[in-house]
From Swiss-Prot:
Full protein name: Guanylate kinase
One cellular component term from this protein's GO annotations in UniProt: cytosol
Annotated ATP binding sites: 51-58
Chief place of localization: cytoplasm
Reaction it catalyzes: GMP + ATP = GDP + ADP
Length: 229
């Protein structure tokens, strides 16, 4: 991807405002220095995993949780409707728009944003509890959330997962058979925007082989623990 294209894609950032000014930003965390200080003094690591939709990030996250007993997944709050099989408090904390807005006003999120037509946010309290128990917390979030958290906490490791190439990514999305043509085009546009922010991450890994990629990411986490402690 050329530098010119990256600049164009960066202008296509898909953050949208919540009632005029409620977008993902560091403001949600910086207003509560005590909460941020707890993060800075916590015993665990924050591991952030980001990638475009269709790159295999969710599958990698599930596999990491299976092979590493010290990892816990950060559970996001969302305004979207539950999908078949999803359980409250396990997959997501499901909120109405008004409930989500109230949590934002109370500075209850480490980060939050609108993605597609729904809001997603990371509750502070649950993450703080895990970190202070000495557990490492795995975040499955986008570049905006990664940027916000990295600015407001220490012991943060950010990993971006790339597809082998754009053509493979598009084919994976089509193979899902869950989106129409318009949705696929939107996902591809957002994917290229995501990829343009990969250079902001500590590590960039290409998922061209699942098992090999899993080993690479786990090795990064283990090395980060050794460095931190």
């Amino acid at each position: 991807m050329t530098t010119k294209n990256k600049r164009v894609l960066q202008k296509c950032a898909y953050r949208e405002e919540f009632k005029g000014d409620m977008e993902r930003s560091t403001a949600a965390t910086s207003k509560l220095p005590l909460e941020v200080e707890l993060s800075r003094n916590s015993k665990g690591l924050i591991i952030i995993l980001s990638s475009p939709s269709g790159t295999g990030k969710s599958s990698l996250a599930k596999a990491l949780l299976k092979i590493d007993n010290n990892l816990r997944l950060s559970i996001s709050a969302t305004t979207r409707k539950p999908r078949l099989g999803e359980v409250e408090g396990i997959n997501y904390y499901f909120k109405t728009g008004l409930e989500f807005e109230e949590l934002v006003k109370q500075n209850k999120f480490l980060e939050y944003a609108k993605i597609y037509d729904n809001y997603y946010g990371t509750p502070k309290e649950y993450v703080e509890m895990l970190l202070n128990q000495g557990l490492d917390v795995l975040f499955d979030i986008d570049w905006q959330g990664a940027r916000s958290i990295k600015k407001n906490a220490t012991n943060v490791v950010t990993i971006f997962v790339l597809p082998p190439n754009i053509e493979v990514l598009e084919q994976r999305l089509r193979n899902r058979a869950t989106d129409n043509e318009e949705a696929i085009k939107l996902r591809m546009q957002l994917a290229q925007n995501e990829i343009s922010h990969a250079n902001e991450y500590d590590y960039v890994v290409t998922n061209d082989d699942f098992d090999r990629t899993l080993k690479k990411i786990h090795a990064i986490i283990v090395a980060a623990r050794d460095k931190a402690f």
